[in-house]
Amino acid sequence: MKFTLISSCVALAAMTLAVEAAPNGKKINIPLAKNNSYKPSAKNALNKALAKYNRRKVGSGGITTEASGSVPMVDYENDVEYYGEVTVGTPGIKLKLDFDTGSSDMWFASTLCSSCSNSHTKYDPKKSSTYAADGRTWSISYGDGSSASGILATDNVNLGGLLIKKQTIELAKRESSAFATDVIDGLLGLGFNTITTVRGVKTPVDNLISQGLISRPIFGVYLGKQSNGGGGEYIFGGYDSSKFKGSLTTVPIDNSEGFWGVTVKSTKIGGTTVSASFDAILDTGTTLLLLPDDVAAKVARSYGASDNGDGTYSITCDTSKLQPLVFTLGSSTFEVPSDSLIFEKDGNKCIAGFAAGGDLAILGDVFLKNNYVVFNQEVPEVQIAPVAN
């Protein structure tokens, strides 16, 4: 099901009790409305993820620090995609951006783009007094043929009440139809700066740190389930301990390729180990749980799921017959419960929330909406705990 904005933002004066009040700390609640015309597609979600990492289609041959900022997330398309509102320019224009730990660029539609959808909010450089041209260009292309390109510039960016000055932004002058049909206006990358399209560009998190806007180089991520009201929240410079239960487990990060890479030590179903260790990427910009082909096949067999020949699996629609999928990271285990194992319902047929990713493994939103993650860019490491009920 598809969800869209139905009312203006409402700013709260202070953080929740679990998150100490902080200068510029704000929360914004955004009610959601349901669009019954939307039909989720696991196949499309899988292909989008594989294209992002330039892989071929499978089968085709709390407490915060003194300074923090909070950005609420809209749960769009029934946990398919999450976006937050970011204000860019002076005076500011609000853009719906995909907060993506699997990439590092900040780009969005602009009035310079004739191919960008009119349904998108477009940033107009002529209307911002703090806009400055950069002179460089950028271009992104993916394995499925989708692409976007444009120019670099700098402007002020307001991220959850934290004002980043002279943030490098990428203005789209052209985008393919795959981007034009998306509800979001662009993307805000939260990966490491070694994978920015134009080398040497500082990411928004880099600038939050270097400009002293946050006193710790961390951000906490909570992706709400639609069954629990949807939404979600990013907190920059801290985290919200009311959003998780128990204590946080520290997991080291391998960022040698610019991603938030972790080692999954084991995978279990009902106490039975179904796979040994494998490396995976924590990616808020990927909907599904992608597993290496051999792991996906073993998980599917354990659930009695059938291979659809395109990387996805058909699975029983009866959640009472499904046991949680359990991953070991660091010294703890983290679950994907039975209700999250079903991604798409089509009559009597259900499509699983996990898929075969070739040699690629991604702990996407299917995992992240069940587990709170604090990303620490400086160490680097993450801390993970199960979300509170």
Curated annotation (Swiss-Prot):
<feature type="domain" description="Peptidase A1">
    <location>
        <begin position="82"/>
        <end position="385"/>
    </location>
</feature>
<feature type="active site">
    <location>
        <position position="100"/>
    </location>
</feature>
<keyword id="KW-0865">Zymogen</keyword>
<dbReference type="InterPro" id="IPR033121">
    <property type="entry name" value="PEPTIDASE_A1"/>
</dbReference>
<protein>
    <recommendedName>
        <fullName>Rhizopuspepsin-1</fullName>
        <ecNumber>3.4.23.21</ecNumber>
    </recommendedName>
</protein>
<dbReference type="Pfam" id="PF00026">
    <property type="entry name" value="Asp"/>
</dbReference>
<dbReference type="GO" id="GO:0004190">
    <property type="term" value="F:aspartic-type endopeptidase activity"/>
</dbReference>
<keyword id="KW-0064">Aspartyl protease</keyword>
<keyword id="KW-0732">Signal</keyword>
<keyword id="KW-0645">Protease</keyword>
<feature type="disulfide bond">
    <location>
        <begin position="317"/>
        <end position="350"/>
    </location>
</feature>
<feature type="active site">
    <location>
        <position position="283"/>
    </location>
</feature>
<keyword id="KW-1015">Disulfide bond</keyword>
<dbReference type="InterPro" id="IPR021109">
    <property type="entry name" value="Peptidase_aspartic_dom_sf"/>
</dbReference>
<feature type="propeptide" description="Activation peptide">
    <location>
        <begin position="22"/>
        <end position="66"/>
    </location>
</feature>
<comment type="similarity">
    <text>Belongs to the peptidase A1 family.</text>
</comment>
<dbReference type="InterPro" id="IPR001461">
    <property type="entry name" value="Aspartic_peptidase_A1"/>
</dbReference>
<dbReference type="InterPro" id="IPR001969">
    <property type="entry name" value="Aspartic_peptidase_AS"/>
</dbReference>
<feature type="disulfide bond">
    <location>
        <begin position="113"/>
        <end position="116"/>
    </location>
</feature>
<keyword id="KW-0378">Hydrolase</keyword>
<feature type="signal peptide">
    <location>
        <begin position="1"/>
        <end position="21"/>
    </location>
</feature>
<dbReference type="GO" id="GO:0006508">
    <property type="term" value="P:proteolysis"/>
</dbReference>
